[in-house]
UniProtKB/Swiss-Prot annotation:
It comes from Bordetella bronchiseptica (strain ATCC BAA-588 / NCTC 13252 / RB50). One of its GO terms (molecular function) is 5'-nucleotidase activity. GO terms for biological process: pyrimidine deoxyribonucleotide catabolic process. Mg(2+) binds at residues 6, 8, 137. Belongs to the 5'(3')-deoxyribonucleotidase family. This is Putative 5'(3')-deoxyribonucleotidase. Dephosphorylates the 5' and 2'(3')-phosphates of deoxyribonucleotides. The keyword Hydrolase applies. CDD domains: HAD_5-3dNT (cd02587). Its cofactor is Mg(2+). Keywords: Hydrolase, Magnesium, Metal-binding. PANTHER family: 5'(3')-DEOXYRIBONUCLEOTIDASE (PTHR16504:SF4).
Amino acid sequence: MLILLDQDGVLADFEHAFIDAWRKRHPDIEPVAFKDRKSFHIREDYAPELRGLAEAIYTAPGFIRDLPPVPGAIEAFRELLALGMDVRICSSPLMQFENCVAEKYLWVERHLGREATQRLILTRDKTLVQGDLLIDDRPVITGAARPRWRHIIYDAPYNRDQTDRPRLDWRNWRNVLAGELYRSDA
């Protein structure tokens, strides 16, 4: 089984790193709490006059590279490989890609090892990537093709209005994926 894992928000903890960076840069302006997020694009949760400040944080040199792993993500990645799954990291770089693309590779190398960089797929359109499952926090994924993969939503406050697909986090992933493996054998 070919499992595609999104990077930011699924493997790399974009959200909490952003909040920490916001507090350091703008201690006088309260950041939007993760639990209160409504939009997949973090800048959209801020007032128009603050969106440039938000964008400056996540496009800054080193931000993507230095993201901490989501708790449990590295262990789940390694366990899936040990179970014989073909696991790939399928990530969309930011439109402001100057730092992002290289830093995604550096993040994978730092947390999963140099060999894992060969498992990294960067694309603006995930519907063009082949796979059986895509685990992604983006609530709706559209593109040029009808994807072959089944979208499993990685749980986040901004995607909880989507109830038509399986949902997981790194605490319950075994149960959710066991159901998907059973389904694929049927």
